[in-house]
């Protein structure tokens, strides 16, 4: 019953906040590539995000997402998924000086043939996960909420935003993993108009928690669960039958932005953030086993012209992430107390993504088109200190995309997106103490390296049709998209996406 009420709530969120019928200009403002060029950078500041859009727009829709890989590119993520979601999104311009936006969603689905991972949020917590060699299909449920508000007074702008996620992932056959996640992010931003530029600063804070356990119900016995520590290593003292743990962490970040007030000129973005996550063993009085640290820096600088009917943008970007992991040295227990006698920084990981991207387009109130491209260098280096283990790969990549949006009549509009990309490996290497590794761990590491150093090619397409009901505030839309990825290891991935909904 709770799910039914929640889905009903999604369908009503935007209905009672809609103020005007959807126009072509509103559809373009919220979906055009060039209008959302800085969505992943400057729009992380809610003061910029809330006042960058001018027209009210809401969507309520259901969507389905299917992905299949002929062999898992990442064992810990499985061979694909089937997900269905109900979602409502709205943006309201409350006045010339204020705006509010929000979203609510419910997702459910299944992930296929997951192995070497019994924890949720693998991308975030890797390598400090609970894992076994058997695995299986996992089910998931996710609730998401987001809300923000921005206001301007004179030359000052202020914004605030909250993003919340609650997720439950589980398996109903042995090994019966379960992960329950709560994740809350708060953002506060401010901006000031000075000279020909808007100067902005923002703060971000995150709180994260996950409870994680694995159970066995069948009489055939149990298999060991490994407390993984990176590149095929485990904390052997606490592996085996210790299967209940939890993660606790979060962090903070700061971002700075400069944007031309007339939408023509140089712009820049910088962000620094730090996060950390503790893994604690609930079976042994919550003794902390490991701690994972993130330190990241993002820098972007470019020039744009977004005024009038022609749009041009070019920028250079650098993303650097350093991850390091501490393993606690735990003494002998005394009355269920496990003293920490020291710690060692054993795992190190360096990620670099630097790229140049550009856009050229044309737009008006009834239609728009644009071409966008991206070329870059990506590098991932991992190291485990002792016994020494190393894995690294570097790629050069390029992507070319295009978008066409047009009103075919007073009631029908069409949007088409297409893209092609290629990731080519330029260097790779691995160092492993294979003589001292279990056969199953060798196979897992070799599979990881095989797909990390592979070349990838991608083709994608998406088409969306909008129909505006005559004399009504409501519009209907249908969207169909997909992509095809080929891998130099003679494997492939296909992905399909379908969405149906209403706009107002």
State where each predicted segment sits:
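N-terminal, post-signal peptide beta-strand-biased segments of exported outer-membrane/organellar beta-barrel
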Residues: 20-112
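Outer-membrane beta-barrel "beta-signal"
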Residues: 25-26, 492-504
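Outer-envelope beta-barrel architecture signal
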Residues: 54-60, 96-102, 154-160, 195-201, ...
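Transmembrane beta-strands of outer-membrane beta-barrel pores
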Residues: 64-70, 106-110, 151-155, 164-168, ...
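Outer-membrane beta-barrel translocator domains and adjoining extracellular loop/strand segments
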Residues: 70-77, 113-119, 170-178, 212-219, ...
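Residues on the lipid-exposed face of transmembrane beta-strands in outer-membrane beta-barrel proteins
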Residues: 86-92, 145-151, 186-192, 254-260, ...
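Long, internal scaffold/assembly segments composed of regular secondary structure
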Residues: 233-373
């Amino acid at each position: 019953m709770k799910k039914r009420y929640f889905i009903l709530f999604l369908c009503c969120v935007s209905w009672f906040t809609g103020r005007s019928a959807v126009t072509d200009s509103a559809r373009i403002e919220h979906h055009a590539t060039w209008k959302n060029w800085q969505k992943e950078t400057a729009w992380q500041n809610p003061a910029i995000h809330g006042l960058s859009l001018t027209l009210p727009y809401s969507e309520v829709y259901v969507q389905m997402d299917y992905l299949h890989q002929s062999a898992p590119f990442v064992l810990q993520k499985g061979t694909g998924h089937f997900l269905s979601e109900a979602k409502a999104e709205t943006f309201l311009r409350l006045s010339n000086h204020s705006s509010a936006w929000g979203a609510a969603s419910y997702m459910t689905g299944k992930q296929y043939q997951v192995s070497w991972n019994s924890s949720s949020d693998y991308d975030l917590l890797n390598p400090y996960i609970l894992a076994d060699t058997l695995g299986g299909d996992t089910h998931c449920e996710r609730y998401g909420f987001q809300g923000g508000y921005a206001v301007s007074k004179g030359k000052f702008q202020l914004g605030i935003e909250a993003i919340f996620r609650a997720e439950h992932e589980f398996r109903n056959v042995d090994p019966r993993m379960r992960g329950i996640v709560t994740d809350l992010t708060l953002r506060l931003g401010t901006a000031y108009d000075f000279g020909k530029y808007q100067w902005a600063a923002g703060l971000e804070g995150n709180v994260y928690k996950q409870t994680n356990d694995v159970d066995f119900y069948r009489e055939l016995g149990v298999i060991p669960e490994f407390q993984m520590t990176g590149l095929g290593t485990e904390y052997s003292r606490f592996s085996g039958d210790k299967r209940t743990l939890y993660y606790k962490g979060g962090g903070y970040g700061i971002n700075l932005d400069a944007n031309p007030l007339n939408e023509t000129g140089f712009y820049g973005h910088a962000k620094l953030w730090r996060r950390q996550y503790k893994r604690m063993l609930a079976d042994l009085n919550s003794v902390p086993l490991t701690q994972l640290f993130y330190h990241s820096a993002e820098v972007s600088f470019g020039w744009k012209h977004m005024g009038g009917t022609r749009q041009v943008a070019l920028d250079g970007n650098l993303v650097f992430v350093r991850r390091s992991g501490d393993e606690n040295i735990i003494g002998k227990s005394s009355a269920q107390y496990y003293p920490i006698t020291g710690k060692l920084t054993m795992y190190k990981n360096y990620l670099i993504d630097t790229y140049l991207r550009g856009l050229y387009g044309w737009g008006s109130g009834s239609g728009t088109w644009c071409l966008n491209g991206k070329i870059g260098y990506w590098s991932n280096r991992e190291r485990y200190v002792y016994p020494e283990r190393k894995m690294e790969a570097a790629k050069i990549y390029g992507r070319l995309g295009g978008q066409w949006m047009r009103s075919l009549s007073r009631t029908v509009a069409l949007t088409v997106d297409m893209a092609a990309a290629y990731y080519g490996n330029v260097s790779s290497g691995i160092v492993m103490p294979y003589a001292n590794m279990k056969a199953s761990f060798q196979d897992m590491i070799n599979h990881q390296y095989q797909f990390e150093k592979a070349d990838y090619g991608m083709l994608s397409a998406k088409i969306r049709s909008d129909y505006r009901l005559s004399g009504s505030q409501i519009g209907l839309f249908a969207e169909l998209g997909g992509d095809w990825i080929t891998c130099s290891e003679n494997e492939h991935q296909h992905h399909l996406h379908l969405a149906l909904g209403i706009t107002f």
